[in-house]
Amino acid sequence: MVDPLKIFWVLTNSTYLVTKFVRIGIADKNDSPPYFDRFLYETEIDENADLQSTVLTVNAKDHNESTNIRYQITGGNIGNAFAVQNTTGVIYVASPLDYETRPRYELRLEATRNRKNNYTTVVINVRDVNDNPPVFDRQTYRTQITEEDDRNLPKRILQVTATDGDVDRPINIVYFLTGQGIDPDNPANSKFDINRTTGDIFVLKPLDRDQPNGRPQWRFTVFAQDEGGEGLVGYADIQVNLKDINDNAPQFPQGIYFGNVTENGTAGSSVMTMSAVDYDDPNESTNAKLIYSIEKNVIEEETGAPIFEIEPETGLIKTAVCCLDRERTPDYSIQVVAMDGGGLKGTGTASIRVKDLNDMPPQFTKDEWVTEVDETNGTYIPETPILTVTVQDEDETNTFQYKVVPNSGFGADKFAMVRNGDGTGSLKIIQPLDYEDPLQSSGFRFRIQVNDKGDDGPGGSDKYHVAYSWVVVKLRDINDNVPKFDREHIEVSIYEDTKVGTILEQFKATDADQGGHSKVAYKIVRSTNRKRQFAISDRGAVSIQRPLDRETQDRHHIQILAIDDGSPARTATATLTVIVKDVNDNAPTFAQDYKPTLPENVSGKKILEVAAKDPDDRLRGNGGPFTFRLDPLASDEIKAGFKVEYDRRGDNENGVAIISSLRPFDREAQKSYAIPIEIKDNGAPAMTGTSTLTVTIGDVNDNKMQPGSKSVLVYNYQGQSQDTPIGRVYVNDPDDWDVPDKKYYWEVQEHQRFKLDTDTGILTMRAGTRRGRYQLRFKVYDREHGQEDIPANLSVTVRDITAEAVQQAGSMRLSHITDEDFVRTWNPVKNQVEPSKLERFRNKLAELLYTDRDNVDVFSVQLKEGSPYPLTDVHFAARSATQQPYFKAVRLNGVVQMHREEIEKDVGLNITMVNINECLHEGKGKCGSNSCTSKVELGKKPYTVSVNRTALVGVRLDISAQCVCRARNFTHQDHNCRTHLCYNGGRCVETRNGPKCVACPVGYNGPRCQQSTRSFRGNGWAWYPPLQLCQESHLSLEFITRVADGLILYNGPIVPPKPEETVISDFIALELEQGYPRLLIDFGSGTLELRVKTKKTLDDGVWHRLDIFWDTENVRMVVDFCRTALVSEMEDGTPPEFDDNACQARGQIPPFAESLNLNQPLQLGGLYRQHFDQTLYNWQYAFSSKGFDGCIRNVIHNSEHYDLAFPALARNSFPACPQTDEVCLKTEHTARCWEHGNCVASLVQAKCHCQPGWMGPGCNVPTIPTTFKAQSYVKFALSFEPDRFSTQLQLRFRTREQGGELFRVSDQHHREYAILELRRGHLQFRYNLNSMRNEEQLLTLTAIAVNDGQWHVIRISRYGSAALMELDGGESRRYNESFHFTGHQWLTIDKQEGVYAGGKAEYTGIKTFEVQSDFQRSCLDDIRLDGKHLPLPPAMNGTQWGQATMARNLERNCPSNRPCSNVICPDPFDCVDLWNEYECTCSEGRIMSSDTKGCVDRNECLDLPCLNGATCINLEPRLRYRCICPEGYWGENCELVQEGQRLKLSMGALGAIFVCLIIILILALIFVLYSRKRKTTKKKKRSGPEKDVRETVISYEDEGGGEDDMTAFDITPLQIPISAQGGPPDIAACKMPIIYPVMTLLPPGQELNVAYLMEERKQRIDKDNNAPPFDDLRNFTFEGSGSIAESLSSLASGTDDENQDFNYLQNWGPRFNALAAMYVHDKAKASSQLPSDGGGGSGDGPGPGASSSSPLGGGGTGGGSGIPGNVLAVVATGSGAGPGGGGGSSGLMPLPEVDKVVL
């Protein structure tokens, strides 16, 4: 039992409880004292022993063996060094021990029990340990030696001594040094050393005290370590001072010193101070005391006296003579000597420059200056100087002041002189100049003056310092006067039937310029003449051009422009007001849209009164009163059923018609009647018109209902539809207005996916209803007839329709048919059900597309609103097979157009428009002749078409015309990755400036990964989407060919027009004819032909570019940017000449059509259309149908690049340009530039065009960007001659600044320039090509900001006065252009002074400059001028094309300023470095939650990245997403498809193939004969399994079965070839050329059903004929393969299989049932899962059974069972018999169709 008090004592360390504890009990009395075994105990302990360390345990004993003995030390414990535990006798260390203080202790130890005690002696000897480090006698040792003393080395300089406090230990101290002059790694370099035992220190080398290599003092440390270098360490400092000797001569560090002295100064003038340096000790005698003297002075020629003197002590140089003359001697050089106290000398040179005083007069470099200047434009005074004058002055320091001498000549008051920073003077205009003033037209002559005193004060009056010169200013006439009309406002009144061509008025304007001889042209402002009803002649006569209509517009305000022939032209405006008077030219009509209803079964009664209206002017008697009557031509049925009575007094005496019925009507016979009513007005002559009144017969519930059934087809858009009404439950009842009399019920119970309105019978499909077929049953009650429980059945079929199907849908508009008629299946005439027009159209379309009808979806049928007669819009989609991408809309529309007549005939339709386009009919829409885009928007709710027996619930599509040019509309908000399609597998990423396509595959180099090039062979074509309608359009393309004739492009009708339809004859055709470009274009009012007779034909095997421009009136075609134009420019200000006949053609569209309306496929390279007479469309010119042979690239319409990779339909057309690719492969560097560049080739040569950021012949050298800091710039000197007509600039940049100049080129005086700059965060390019006046042109990318910190690539292309801007590929908002050749065309570039990057430096002083438009805190990279790389310091200062002659404040690379370094973002956001800016946002792959407080996974599948019908699966943020591709597609986004290219084989190749086929047939015959012989041999040998161990069936159950020799196994069956070309080696020579896959792409896809997709993929693998194993007999499982058993013989008796659980194989699906049957021990369970219709089999071997349920058919290896035990044999092809011989049939498919079996 543990005593708790003892525990407490231990825990509290309390001796009180222990000493006071008294054990109470009864015991024997013991009064004997305790005793010790010995009288003396002796032990040892180290002096460094730890406190509490046990020294010795001494135990006393008691005669009664008592343990109650207490111990204490009573003597000898000096310093309480030890203590004893009073109960145990353990002596321990209580205080630190020190051997050197007390080496021995003799303790007296007392033991006490019951007040009886005894004593003993304990002797403790303290052992010495090394606990004292050596101690030096001094802390610092100092000594002095003389520098450079090399005598008696090494020399002892002092001795150090250290002692060890451990007195009784061996004295064995070792010394060593560290510090200055000590090199432990290489002792040979040390300056000092020490004797390790004596402490003597030696100097080893002579020491130098003096600078620059010496030192006056050496300090190092000496260490002493006892125990022979193994013990403790002590240290001391050593200081060695060096005594100086005079061993250094004085010297002048700079060698040459520069000073100044003013000319004409007095003698003794201070010039400069020369200071020499002596490194000797200045405190050591006179070693460093210097005395200066002039050793070589200059002598004054006249007197022979020295010119300069020097003060010996200070070195101050003074003039010794007076009056130095700078103009005589501008500088002097003297030699000065400095000598120290020891006589050592040093020499320096003083270069003295005489500073100038203004003591010489100025002089103009010309006596007369002549210049020519434009007259000023009104009161505007230009700031630019018109003349720069220069002055010569022998003085160096001058401050020139210029001025015009007042009253010195005519014009002196109109000009002023100003001083320039470089000392020249400029003449500026200060008052308006007017050429039209006869006095001024002859020019001006006056004097100017200059003085070099800098002011007009007293110095200016000093005639000695003033010079004069004459100035002659010639004045040029400019177009500064606007034309002036004689009459600015004219008003005329005419009747609306005035004949076309009638002249209304004559305008006349004059212009004061050119002496009144300026020509004036006249023009009507188009916005005031929208319908082009008026025209104006060259002489100003305004006439009627098109008929007028007062009812449309009764007053016209026509603005007339008078335009002079100046440059730039000036205009004046006048107004013609045309008042149109009325004539009676309109027939009256109904006053309103009457819709009367007449109940059925009612006798004759009044229906309603009808009034009339007339748009003609009633005040002129051209309106009412009206008269009415029934149209005499009305049918007899109408005449018998209705009457029309005229009431003169009705409608306020205007007259009305009273309509009445004459008999009762039956609605079930006819639902409505159209009554024609003739209305006549009161005009002279009167106008008569016929209006039709539709009377609807109202329904009465007078028929009993019969059971009915109805089928409903629902298209569920992306499976996301909400609750959707799908129509009314149908019963067969002729009445159709009797819904209030009926009640509708479910027959049994309500279906969970549908909801019924019992009052209306409307059935609603609930949200989330999946695709499939639903059979629904209802009952209907009719209270009117008392009918109950009339059955009504409803079949609902739900189909999913994808976004891809809607996007790629074709469309057509049907006339005179309603949406109900299109889907109706009941024929009331034949009184029977028949296929609807929808189904017939669907079948016909499937036939035309060569696809199954199930692959055609007619998913939207809508009745167009607002039409006077029924118009129905139909949208449809189709594909070649399930899981395949949908056909493109262009293909669907084209096929329907091509077969329109056939479809109309077979289906019974009237197709009025294919590819529904609300912009197609010019002038009928809201946009008029403006830009127009037909936009299709997805409605929020489905569109339901419900008729009695059928209903279609389709996708609602709202089509509207928007008056914008789609490509140039930058205001829409839905600019994101969902609308910004990236082609060909490119990946769309969202940026702050909108979506951007990245990771484009190689060869797809368009801005959105478009394929830019396509080739044609002369007999092909390719279809693409039609050209969009824009008010101003620009179409450009490039082509290359060696064939002189061929159709390059055509967009227009592809079928002849129908006789009764409105003909839309618009088309555009571009072709080569005899090597020259020819354009035909027709807006519908006449064909315009443009031809360009180029200097050389364009079939020269070189790429050529054609640009076609058109607006509402004008068309222009430009060839190769007009680089071949003849340009003539003079320096005297003569207007330039520009002859563009060989590069440009212009024309006007015949009136009056104003827009190119197209909705047919755009065809490139040829023509695919029906042959028809082109005169059917009234075309005045015919174009060739011969195909183009060559390549076409970069087809761009209004800055949108066409993707040429996958046309909707094509023939004999291929992506890329194989003809030029062959040229690229001919040279090594062009064949290897694909990784970071593009090979650009013609048919004769190729070169590498490097991607931005790369350079070098093979585009394999990365460029290095440069950071431009504040006040930074680079000035270049070019080593090539820039083209004056063309300028190409490309560079990369990144910035966050609002402004700055990126690059500029200019002439010497910066009057002609081209500047790329940043303004308010947007790029702009401005240029001026006229050195005489400012005619600046400006291009800006206003729709996109570029100061987002991202890298951008800008490309500027200037051709003459035309310019193009392309940012990051240049599409849509990243493109702008000015494509007009007007005025000057040349830009002169100064190669040395005119090329800058980062801003232009203006020097404000000798060493100070200021950078204008400083491009700072930004980066530039890869600057190319005319395609040539310019260097960017500091990484590169020069290339073969130029040098960076000046550069300031630049930094290599483009690092960020680490904005996240001091930012802590709140969880869960991360700080993202956006380059010089940061953002706390979510990590990659995540987006901010709706409450902006957290991050959630970004669903990349919403961007529809998976193409071609692939399924998108959203993954974790790091992995983003994954696409499951349909059959035949691959790639990250399923964008690629393998398409075998057709090979053209020569006769030699065909012969080789024929020979190979013969050899193969012979070998096949030999193989057959050999096989038959071998089979016969096998049958003879097979007498039992014991005969040959190579038999595959053995009696494994026998004792020792399977233990025979198995090494004779025939290995031949195991030699399975991996390709189909197995056989003898000779066959390899007959292999066909390899057909490499071609990457192609089909249209974007949408999500698929994953389960269905996996099933389809498995079926495809089963049917793949091209993948191994191939048709042959193979051993798929052989003995011992993949098993832990060594042979099949061990399977029956072994136990290893018992430990293996293969039951999981049963869960792998039916395709793995055979594998499960092999390994699962429960054979019955496995067999029960196999198909049940497999055939049985029989064989020669003793198989375990005859029946088989294997999907492989009956027959096993040697047995009748399909799967005998654990043995498997597979027959891949043939009759289904296994190797054992048993016959069988497949449970899955007929065996002859099986290509292979996959387990």
Swiss-Prot record:
Q: Where in the cell is it found?
A: Cell membrane
Pinpoint the EGF-like domain residues: 973-1010, 1220-1260, 1497-1535
Residue ranges of every copy of the Cadherin domain listed in the record: 37-136, 137-252, 253-364, 368-485, 486-590, 590-709, 708-812
Spell out the InterPro entries in the cross-references.
Answer: Cadherin (IPR039808), Cadherin-like_dom (IPR002126), Cadherin-like_sf (IPR015919), Cadherin_CS (IPR020894), Cadherin_Y-type_LIR (IPR000233), Catenin-bd_sf (IPR027397), ConA-like_dom_sf (IPR013320), EGF-like_Ca-bd_dom (IPR001881)
The regions listed as transmembrane in this protein's record are 1549-1569
- Where are the stretches annotated Disordered? 1726-1799
What biological-process GO terms show up in the record? axon extension involved in axon guidance; calcium-dependent cell-cell adhesion via plasma membrane cell adhesion molecules; cell migration; cell-cell adhesion mediated by cadherin; cell-cell adhesion via plasma-membrane adhesion molecules; homophilic cell adhesion via plasma membrane adhesion molecules; neuron projection development; ommatidial rotation
Indicate the segments forming the Laminin G-like domain, all copies. Answer: 1011-1217, 1263-1454
User: What SMART domains does the entry give?
Assistant: CA (SM00112), EGF (SM00181), EGF_CA (SM00179), LamG (SM00282)
Q: Which domain of life is it from?
A: Eukaryota
Q: List the disulfide bonds in this chain.
A: C977-C988, C982-C997, C1000-C1009, C1191-C1217, C1224-C1239, C1233-C1248, C1250-C1259, C1419-C1454, C1501-C1512, C1506-C1523, C1525-C1534
Q: How does it sit in the membrane?
A: Single-pass type I membrane protein
Mainly resides where? membrane
Q: Which UniProt keywords apply?
A: Calcium, Cell adhesion, Cell membrane, Disulfide bond, EGF-like domain, Glycoprotein, Membrane, Metal-binding, Repeat, Transmembrane, Transmembrane helix
Extent of Gly residues compositional bias? 1733-1744, 1752-1763, 1775-1786
> Which CDD domains does the UniProt entry name for this protein?
Cadherin_repeat, EGF_CA, LamG
Name by which UniProt lists this protein: Putative neural-cadherin 2
Give the species this sequence originates from: Drosophila melanogaster (Fruit fly)
